[in-house]
Amino acid sequence: MQTDNFNHNTTEVDGLKWHWVEQGEGPAIVLLHGIPESWRCWQHQIPTLAKQFRVIAPDMKGYGQSGKPKGDYAASTVAAETLAFLDAIGVEQFHIAGHDWGVVIADNIINLAPSRVERYIRCCLSLHTYDARNSLHHQWNGRNPEKACQLMANADAYVRVWYESSCKPESRTDEAEIEEIIKEFSYAGISDVVPLYFAHIRNSIPVDYSKFTMPVLYIHGEHDPRQPIEYARGMEEHIPGLEAVLVLDAGHFVTWERPAEVTNAMMWFLHSMLASGLPLFDRSRHHGLPTKPVHDVESWGVNPGIARPKAG
């Protein structure tokens, strides 16, 4: 039984169980998490997004309370299954956001059905197509699936290592949030199938980034050790409609580390389509990517108490 303030749902589509959180009404926005997470990756963003959007945050296949079948976990396969899930709950056109491995699935969703995606927010994952360095730990997991299973089976240790090594020390999530993440990564079967995402990565249909003609926002943590900022160099050459924001004093898990700043950037990016049409961000010289949101955090009703002071 869920004890939080979110609306939880389950359904089965083509034999695959889906668990998701849904809040709000309006244009749909789909939020996809990465590893080692669940729908809770977006729990700080959902309440504000739900003021204007129908927010859909699923546990991805193999994670949380969704189904964990053995079989094909190639990104293009999971993307097709996610599209079938969206069909089943009546979502045709949508905005989409992904963090970490959620970006991989979102990229593949756009590759399969670009006309269905209105706007795209990618968080903390550069383009694997032209920088193999981005995939070193993915390659290890894919080549050592049994060892990856053993590591993930100890959810408490696995999650803590990921967050302690990936967040900027002074911006790490608190103990209560870490325990929530551990709980969601502790469901039976997760450690057996999540490594298959890595093992099957080469089985996926190649992504054609020329299909990414919708507006795209890239959000990057300033001190992300998993995806150093230099990995983003040249991304705008592959995605012509790209805008970007650098989240200061944050590591890899920006939705937890700097929740107000991420929510603010997402709302401004999405709202620009609904209203103003003004330039989204001030430009900087940092790899040609823009870095500064033009609206205050309070503009979207976000609790300023969770916004930490920016450095410098």
Region roles according to the model:
Residues 2-6, 18, 28, 63-65, ...:
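Flexible "cap/lid" subdomain of the alpha/beta-hydrolase fold that forms the substrate-access gate
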Residues 7-13:
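Short acidic-hydrophobic surface loop/beta-edge motif
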Residues 16-65, 226:
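Conserved HGGG/HGGXW glycine-rich cap/lid loop of the alpha/beta-hydrolase fold
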Residues 242-312:
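Catalytic active-site module of serine/aspartate enzymes centered on a nucleophile-bearing elbow/loop
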Residues 10, 57, 246-247:
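Conserved residues in the N-terminal Rossmann fold of short-chain dehydrogenase/reductase
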Residues 38-39, 104, 250-251:
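A short, glycine- and basic residue-enriched loop/turn
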Residues 40, 44, 230, 257-260:
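Generic recognition of short, well-ordered alpha-helical segments
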